[in-house]
């Protein structure tokens, strides 16, 4: 089996540490009841400004694309939660695609607040990773 321990407090990028077979695996957990998962585009992308115009120079190389994310869609009733398990690289690719598309649509200038880098992704964007527990098991040498 897997032993998992949550972290209380502010540990960057790690909410749970899983351990099995002499291997440990940091896991980032995001939970939501409805809506979207908000984040900051600057975390995932290299964004610079030319006045109010945002220019994406590419994906940030500071990101650990292999960090495991578990997105929990909390159900209405006990036992109805959905789990989506994927690498942080999936999030970075989604943010890159959608953020670029949005900036292209608005000629590089965010309509409400040109300086914001707020962005989000949705459960529908990661539905293919539902119950993808094998990602964790493989990383812990349990395959």
Give names to the regions the model predicted.
Residues 1-12, 17-143:
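Mixed-charge (Asp/Glu-Lys/Arg
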């Amino acid at each position: 089996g897997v032993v998992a321990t949550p972290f209380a407090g502010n540990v960057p990028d790690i909410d749970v540490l899983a351990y099995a077979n002499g291997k440990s695996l940091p896991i980032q957990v995001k939970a939501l009841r409805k809506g979207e998962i908000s984040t900051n585009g600057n975390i995932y992308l290299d964004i610079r400004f030319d006045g109010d115009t945002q220019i994406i120079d590419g994906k940030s190389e500071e990101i650990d694309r292999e960090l495991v994310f578990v997105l929990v869609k909390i159900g209405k009733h006990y036992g109805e939660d959905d789990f989506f398990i994927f690498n942080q690289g999936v999030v970075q690719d989604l943010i890159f695609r959608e953020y670029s598309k949005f900036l292209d649509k608005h000629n590089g200038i965010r309509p409400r607040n040109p300086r914001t880098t707020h962005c989000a992704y949705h459960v529908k964007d990661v539905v293919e990773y539902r119950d993808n527990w094998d990602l964790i098991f493989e990383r812990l040498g349990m395959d």
